[in-house]
C-alpha cells in the first residue's frame, strides 16, 4: 500500500470533543502514525443525499415549521458539497507521495446551523423556519426528539447532535497549494442543496435515484442509501 486517504471530521484543536468527533480524530492519528504516508481530509457537514448530517437538516426542515432546538443551532459550521469532497479524495493521488498530514476542507460559506436549515427551506420552496434556542435542551434530549419527528435512527442522531456542540470551521487552507480549487470555485451551500434535491423545473419535489436530473451526479441518492435518505418534501407547512 503506497498511500492512505482518510476522510475525517473538522474539529477544534482544543477543548472537549464529542465521542463521535474524538473517534474520527483518533482514527486519523492512527493512520498518520502508521508507516504508510497518509492524507487526512477533515470536513464538516457534507451536503448530499445520504449524508447523515445533511439528511437530519432535510428532515427537520421539511417537517417542523416551528422548532425548539439546543443552543448549538447558533454554532458555526462550514459545509461542503459532496462533489467537492469527492474531488479532493480523487485528486489526493496527485499530492507528493511522501506527504503525511491533515488538511481542512470546507465550502465557501460559514453558517450557523439554523441558517443552514433556512437555506434548505429556501431551496426546497418552503417558508422560513422559526427556531427557538433552548439552553435546557440537552444533546441526549434533542436526539430523542429528532428520532421521534424524523426517520433518522436515534443511534445516528445521538453522535451527530453531540458533535454539533463544537464550531466546525476550516482553520487553514493549505490544501489550496496542493489541490487548487476549481476555476468556478467550490460550491456554495445553497447550490449544493439544490443539486442534492435535484428538483425539476416543472415542480417535481421528490428525488429518487432512478429519476435524478443529472445521471450519476455525486449529490444524488444511491440504491445503497438508507431508507431515511432522500425523502420528499412536505408542503403543508
Kindly give the residue locations of the regions a language model identified.
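A short helix->loop->beta-strand "cap" motif at the edges of active sites that frequently abuts
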Residues: 1-3, 35-36
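SDR active-site strand-loop-helix element
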Residues: 4-9, 41-43
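NAD(P)H-binding glycine-rich loop region in Rossmannoid oxidoreductase-like domains
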Residues: 1, 9-16
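Short, Φ-rich (hydrophobic/aromatic) sequence segments
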Residues: 59, 160-161
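Oxidoreductase cofactor-interface core, primarily capturing Rossmann-like NAD(P)-dependent enzymes
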Residues: 15-124, 148-151
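Conserved beta-strand edge residues that scaffold enzyme active sites
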Residues: 10-11, 45, 135
Amino acid at each position: 500500500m503506497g498511500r492512505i486517504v482518510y476522510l475525517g471530521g473538522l474539529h477544534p484543536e482544543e477543548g472537549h470533543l464529542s465521542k463521535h468527533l474524538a473517534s474520527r480524530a483518533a482514527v486519523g492519528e492512527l493512520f498518520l502514525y502508521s508507516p504508510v504516508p497518509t492524507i487526512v481530509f477533515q470536513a464538516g457537514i457534507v451536503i448530499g443525499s445520504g449524508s447523515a448530517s445533511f439528511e437530519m437538516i432535510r428532515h427537520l426542515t421539511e417537517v417542523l415549521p416551528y422548532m425548539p432546538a439546543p443552543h448549538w443551532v447558533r454554532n458555526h459550521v462550514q459545509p461542503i458539497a459532496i462533489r467537492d469532497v469527492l474531488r479532493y479524495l480523487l485528486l489526493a493521488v496527485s499530492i507528493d507521495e511522501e506527504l503525511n498530514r491533515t488538511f481542512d476542507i470546507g465550502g465557501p460559506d460559514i453558517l450557523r446551523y439554523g441558517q443552514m436549515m433556512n437555506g434548505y427551506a429556501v431551496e426546497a420552496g418552503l417558508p422560513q423556519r422559526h427556531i427557538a434556542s433552548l439552553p435546557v435542551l440537552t444533546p441526549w434530549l434533542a436526539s430523542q426528539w429528532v428520532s421521534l419527528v424524523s426517520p433518522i435512527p436515534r443511534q445516528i442522531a445521538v453522535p451527530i447532535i453531540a458533535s454539533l456542540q463544537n464550531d466546525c470551521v476550516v482553520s487553514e487552507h493549505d490544501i489550496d497549494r496542493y489541490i487548487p480549487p476549481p476555476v468556478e470555485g467550490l460550491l456554495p451551500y445553497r447550490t449544493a442543496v439544490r443539486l442534492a434535491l435535484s428538483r425539476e423545473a416543472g415542480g417535481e419535489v421528490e428525488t429518487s435515484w432512478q429519476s435524478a436530473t443529472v445521471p450519476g451526479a455525486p449529490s444524488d441518492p444511491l440504491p445503497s442509501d438508507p431508507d431515511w435518505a432522500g425523502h420528499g418534501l412536505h408542503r403543508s407547512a
